[in-house]
C-alpha cells in the first residue's frame, strides 16, 4: 500500500514571525499540529472521534521562512500505525516549495475517562491504514 500525503495550506500571521524576521520555531509546532488534525479528520474523524495525545515531536529546521511569506504548506503522511500509536512524518514547505522543516511525531490514542492510552480499534486502524503507509506493528 502506498503512502497518502495530506496537504494543507496555512496562512501566516504577523505575530508568527520573530524579531529576526523569520517564522518563529515554536509556530512550526502549531502549524504541524493543525496539519495532523486535518489528516486525522480526513481519516478517523474529528478529535472527539479519536482523542489522542502527542508523546513525541521533533523538528529539523532546514531553511528559513522569512517575514512576508503569506502562507506555508504542510504535508503529512501517516508513517506507521501501532497498537495504540500513530507515527506521522511531516514537512513544512516555503512559499517557493522548498523544504523548510522536517518533523516526526507520535500520537497515542487516549481514553479520556480512564486518563490513559488505549488500543486503536479495528475501524480506526483500517481508516488510518487507508491514509497511511500500511506499516503496522
Q: What positions do the PLM features span?
A:
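Terminal targeting signals and extreme-terminal segments of soluble enzymes
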Residues: 1-73, 79-137
Amino acid at each position: 500500500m502506498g503512502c497518502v500525503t495530506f496537504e494543507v495550506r496555512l496562512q501566516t500571521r504577523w505575530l508568527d514571525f520573530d524579531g529576526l524576521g523569520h517564522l518563529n520555531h515554536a509556530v512550526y509546532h502549531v502549524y504541524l499540529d493543525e496539519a495532523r488534525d486535518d489528516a486525522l479528520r480526513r481519516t478517523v474523524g474529528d478529535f472527539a472521534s479519536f482523542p489522542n495525545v502527542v508523546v513525541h515531536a521533533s523538528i529539523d529546521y532546514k531553511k528559513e521562512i522569512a517575514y512576508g511569506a503569506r502562507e506555508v504548506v504542510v504535508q503529512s503522511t501517516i508513517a506507521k500505525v501501532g497498537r495504540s500509536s500513530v507515527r506521522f512524518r511531516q514537512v513544512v514547505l516555503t512559499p517557493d516549495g522548498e523544504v523548510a522543516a522536517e518533523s516526526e511525531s507520535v500520537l497515542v490514542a487516549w481514553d479520556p475517562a480512564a486518563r490513559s492510552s488505549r488500543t486503536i480499534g479495528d475501524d480506526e486502524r483500517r481508516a488510518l491504514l487507508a491514509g497511511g503507509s500500511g506499516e503496522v506493528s
